[in-house]
Each structure stands twice: as structure tokens, then as C-alpha cells.
Amino acid sequence: MSTVAYPRICPFCESACGLKVEVDPGSAQIIKISGDPDHPLSRGFVCPKSQGLRSLRDDPDRLRKPLLREGTEFREIEWDEALERAAAGFKSVIERHTPSSIGLYTGNPQAHIAPLQMAVAGLLGAMPALYANSGSIDCYPRFLVDVYLYGNLGHVPVPDIDRTDFFLAFGANPLVSNGSMFGASNLPQRIRKLQARGGKLIVVDPRRTETARVADEHFAIRPGSDALLALAMIDTIFSEGLANCGRLTASVSGLDDLRTAAANYDADRVAPLVGVSADRIRQLAREFSSASRAVAYCRVGANCQTFGSLAVWAIDCLNIITANLDEIGGAMFPAGVLPQFMNAPYIDGQPPHGRWRTRVSKTPELGGTVPTTALWEEIETAGKGQIRGLLVICGNPVLSNPNAERVAAALDDLEFMVAIDIYLNETTRHADLILPPMDHLKRTDFTMIWNNWMVEDTVCYSPATFPRDPGDLDDWEIVMGLGARLSGTDPARFERQSAEAYLASCRPGLPRFPEDMTVSEALDLASGDSMPERIYDVILRTGREGEAFGAYPEGLSLQRLQQTPSGINFGPMRPGRMPAAIDTPDRRLAVAPPLLLADLDRLETAIADGFYGDNHFMLIGRRHLRSNNSWMHNLQNLAKGPARCTALMNPADAERIGIVSGDSIRVRSRVGAIVVSAELSDEVGVGVISIPHGFSRELPGSKLNLAHRLGGANVNILHDDMAADGPSRGAAFNATPVDVEPVGTRHAKGDQRRGQAQ
């Protein structure tokens, strides 16, 4: 058999690894998916998720034509009718109510689809909407700290794992996540190299995760206590005279206030709350501060909790006060060949936070978006400006948002809903129209947002693997078609206007954009078979390494990138971006932002109220290597194997409430209850229960046959939307207090104190 191998960017996580997709041209079937050995970042590494491209293409449940709701059923319609109906529906909502009656929700895949990122900006110009996205679920505390500490929502510090000697990871499982907000493909090998050169990996996590198993030391803290541990370390560093901001000393403000705040969380006080001895906390602080090159990093476990902003802030401060910020081996700020697409600095003294507030709860915006919890209450609450129409793009908030039953009820309350999605799932079943984009392998691909978080400055372009079929539309075309109809503009003109507006917003971050050239002129000169490709070309030509329309003949362009099918690597992160890149009003790193210091009062209240006590279970999540949120549970080659939607419990807790592995338990929180199978393991400590998210039982109207046959429970029925992080209002998926009881098991000994049903 003669096959053809196509280079491809894996679209399933932030590492954006390089793949080789081997195809039989005659049958148009995928024969093999493997790692691309020539990819300059992943270098042949591949994880199981990559194999999902085959199942995703062949999935019989995948939608291939638009669906229109008729009563409780859906029927297929053609694209022109679908887009006309979608635009007419939103216009009708606006006419009956107000222009502020539309909401927009975008899910995680948006960040993996470069044209969709650009298209959403154009759509918001045609249909202003209250915008919530999945960033408020897993990133808001990170972004808020970036704003107040560094002055820019886009300044995300990335651990320099390849050159560090001491990697301290809070609430992160990079062996499974492949690195989150930390683009470092093949992390197993990078960690082995760290340890081979004499470095240490320390993991702070309530569960003995896959990463914790290979760590030099694992601190099994109580869920939700990351901020307490980091503050105790800060106090030790200050009190023992170990603090040193290095070359950035003159560019740091608030050190005295930080020292005073941390002094209230000395190791002796914090130890019983965290579950780590005071001596070990102090020793960890000494080891971290004395390492020649150290970095503290945190992700979802520390970020997605009720004290997420405090945790991220305190962990970042560890890097600053030990001279490990913006230094080789520390926390660094990539300056990629592409512009910082999340660039949002202070403007005239105003941070990109709180410039306006929502109607109902007066929740402050962050970077122009609002927390998803604010979106649901805007749908529920009557009055002028109530959200009555909603567009959901590649998201499944019924499975991914806290208090999931409230989310589903809010969707039922809408007058009109459109979903751009490839499945009839737990969320899209509520829609009036479902608009499915074509197979990912039929479109070109380009790394964009992830370049801003990569440990090596890598840029890649992938040609389409398969030809399009008649009637196929990609995400860009769907959104542009909807926007044109909403604005009453010729589609080609709307596309051009959207492209020009997008490039104008990028221009400040394009150092080689000719001063005497307009964005319209640049687009006219650009190459590419589609408008998104022409945008890529302009960005590449005018970025840091660009050829600037002939001024630098050896520079970068789309054509040059296409001639290097595995991508181009411009080297590792470079130190020295600070202090020039600090965007706070006084151009100093603000280690004691008043907003975060004020949130310590809420932490004190939680301590006093027994939040860290032992009178309830603490629920945490967990990742699986063969899954990503709810994306992959309907893909045969990834969903096979043992059941994954189980509740990990410590054997001592199981004995106390009278269950064994495989028994059903009822887990109950303030907002809901689910029944799930127990799996006993000493991976979690006493009082901790771990359930993954993205699973669901079959709901009326949804069509995910494999996922529903495998079953599972929606853990987000348990997570409390009112327990959100205080300063950012980001969602809390870890350290949710719950009670546990047996369900119909002969092993039950009756209710126990921990786990008693309420």
C-alpha cells in the first residue's frame, strides 16, 4: 500500500506537538498517527490523545450538517438556511429586548483553532454580547495576578524546566496535562533530564499524581491550602534573611507589606491547616531559596479553588523574592515571534479589570470577559438587559461549569440559542440550531496562542490532510457568515473588515510592521489561500523575526514556514525582559496588591469556620492522559479500558463508612448530589475524595452513544458556583466540602461523622 504522511499540529492540548498523519490516498483513511521526529519542539514525542484524530474523523455521532430544532427533535438543513435562521433569531431577540440581551460562551477548543480566535473578535463587532469563556473556569486567578503583579493580563510566567535545578509544582500534573500554560512537549523526558543533572522535582498536591510518583518529594497537603503553604514559605524566607530580589530589587514595590502579610502565616500556625510539619515547611523554603536556579509553578489544582488568586500570587512571589523571576532556570516570560495575543496592559492607570461590571451581581470584567457564573445569573434574572439569546461555540458548559444543574436550567430559560459544535451533547441539546464545523484534518492549522507560553519559541503551520467535501464549512466561515448576516454586510466585505480590525489590534505587538503601511495594504500584499492564511502571513512578516515585506530577505513569512513543514524553532526563552516589560503604572512589580491583601480576611474567616477541619470530605478533581475535559469520551480508541469516572477514596475512610472498592456512594454538596462508584487508593489522604470531570449519564436529546454507554457522573453537579475565587470570581473545582454515604451496599455500617448525609 502506498501512503502519504502529512505533518500536523496536534490540536488537543497546549503542547501543540508535531504529528505525522499517514494516509491511504485511495481510501482517504488514516493508517497511522505518530510523532514527528523533525518537529523542533516535540521531537517525535506523542501522547495517546493524538490518536483521537482518527476516531474524531470517523465518529458516527459527529454532526456533518446543521441541525434545526423542531419540537423535541432535530432535522438536518442546508447551510444558507441555517445561517439565515441563526441571524434572524438573534435579531429578533434584540428587537424584542435590547442590544445587550445576547450572551456568548466559548469553550476550550477555541484556543486551539487559530481562525476561530480571530473570527470571534469580528463577530463581537457585529453582535455585541456579554462574553464568558472557559478561561474563567481554569485561568482567571492566573490572569488576575498577572494584571496586578506584572501589569498585563498576558504576562504569564513560564517555568524554565530545561535549565532549572529546583522545580516546585503546586497543583499541577504535567506528566498528564503535558504542561498547562507551560508549552513543553515530552515532559517525562524533560523531568528525567532535570533529575539526571542533579536537580529536584517537588510536587505539592493532595493526590499522589502521576507527576508526584516520579518526584523527589511529594507534599500531600490538604485541598485548598496552597496559599497557606506558600505564605508560610514566604514568611520563613523573610524571617531568616533569605529574601533577595536580585537585579530586579529596584523594580519591586510592596516588599514590606508582603513581609507583614506573610508574618501572620508562620510555619507553626500553618502546619496543622496544611497537613505538613512546620520543620518541613521551613526546610522547603530554605531549599528553594538556596537553589542556584529554582522555579515555583502552579496550575489547575492551585488555581481552581476558592483561594486561587491568593495561591497564584503567593507562589509567584516566591519566585520574585528569591531572584528567580525573569532569570534562566526560573519563571520566565516568552517573547515569541508572534505577538502576545492576550496583551492587556494598564491604560491611563486603569487595569484591564473592573472597567465595567455586570448587571446583576456587579461582577467586574477581566480582560473584557466575565466569569461564567455571571452569565448564568444574567440569563436567570429578569429586567432590562436580561440575556435572552445565547451563542455557544465549542463548549459544553453543562459538563464543565460548577453547579451544572443550574447551568442546564438557565439554558432552558433562553428564548433562542445557537451552538457551533460537532456533537449533540449535554449542552447543545438545549439549542435551537447546531452548526457543525468540518473535520479538523480538512483545514490548515497554525500555532498561535500557545506560542506565548512555550519554553522554546516554536512556530508551525500544517496544510490540510484531506480535501473538503461539498457543503463543508470551517469555524471561520461559519462565524464570518453569521456576522455578515447580523450586520447586513456583504460576506466578503465583512470578512475583510474583520481581518483588518484584527490586524490593527495586533499591530502594536508587531515590531517590523512598516510605519508607512496600512493594515489594508499589508493584507493586499499578503499571500495565502484564505483570509486567515493572509492574516498569518502579515503577522509572520511583521513580527520579531519577519521579513517585513522585503526589508529582511531572510526573515519569516508564511511561505517560508510552509517550506519548513515541521516548523521552526527560534530557541529557548530569553532572560532580561523585565523591568522593561513591566506594565504597572509605576513600572514596578507590585508584590502586595491591595485587592489580594484584602482577600486575606476571607482566608482568615475560612480558617475560623473550620474550612480546613476534618468534619467533611474535601473533593478534588483529576486528569487522565487519554482524555481532555469532555472532548474525548465518545472516541473509541481513547475511551476504552477500565472505568475512569470513579471516586478515589482512602481505604481508612472506606472502612469508616463501610464500603469496599466498586460500591456505589452518594456524594453530596451544598448544591447537588451524585452517585458514583468508589475506588479505594492511598493516592489520596484521609478526608480527600477525587472525581474527574467531563463525564455524564445520558440526558434526553443528547447523542453520544459511546460516552453514555460507558457512563459516569457529572461531578460539576457538586461543585459550588458560589464558592468561586474571591478576587477573580474564577470557578472552584478543588476543595469542595462534601459528605459521603454508602448506597444500597451490604457492607454499609451506617452513617459516620465524616461522610454523614445532610
Predicted regions and their residues:
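Flexible, glycine/charged-enriched surface loops at secondary-structure junctions
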Residues: P99-S101, A243-L248, V295, D326-F333, ...
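Glycine/threonine-rich phosphate-binding loop and adjacent beta-strand/alpha-helix elements that clamp
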Residues: L441-R468, I478, G483, S487-G488
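Flexible glycine/proline-enriched surface loops and loop-helix/loop-strand junctions
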Residues: G171-N173, V214-A215, N264-D268, Y297-A302, ...
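Catalytic, metal-anchored helix/loop core of enzyme active sites in primary metabolism
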Residues: D432
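Extended redox/cofactor-interaction regions of prokaryotic respiratory oxidoreductases
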Residues: Q117-K193, G199-V204, L228-L231, C317-R429, ...
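Long, contiguous, secondary-structure-rich segments that constitute the structural scaffold
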Residues: T465, G471, D475-G543, S630-L648, ...
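Active-site phosphate/pyrophosphate-binding segments
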Residues: M233, S251-T372
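N-terminal export/assembly segments and adjacent metallocofactor-ligating motifs
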Residues: M1-E240, S277, S361, E365, ...
